[in-house]
């Protein structure tokens, strides 16, 4: 597993506060999915950061950040 660089994440989502919310929201989604499958092998927070770095998920202006 390659370490996720914060500069890479900031280049994808420039606002550090929005980045934090996007990462935490995605990590919660992953945790719920993995908990349901009972296969939590890796930290959902790391998985969320990797997904953003690899551009598997993205945030755009106007996206809903509320739960």
UniProtKB/Swiss-Prot annotation:
Keyword Cell division appears in the UniProt entry: no
Endpoints of the signal sequence: none
NADP is among the record's keywords: no
Gene3D superfamilies xref list: 3.90.940.10
Protein name: DNA-directed RNA polymerase subunit omega
Assigned keywords, A-Z: DNA-directed RNA polymerase, Nucleotidyltransferase, Transcription, Transferase
GO BP annotations, alphabetical order: DNA-templated transcription initiation
């Amino acid at each position: 597993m390659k370490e996720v660089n914060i500069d890479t994440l900031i280049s994808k989502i420039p606002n550090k506060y929005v980045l934090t919310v996007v990462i935490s929201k995605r990590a919660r989604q992953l945790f719920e999915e993995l908990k349901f499958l009972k296969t939590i092998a890796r930290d959902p927070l790391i998985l969320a950061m990797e997904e953003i770095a690899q551009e598997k998920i993205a945030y755009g202006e106007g996206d809903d950040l509320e739960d």
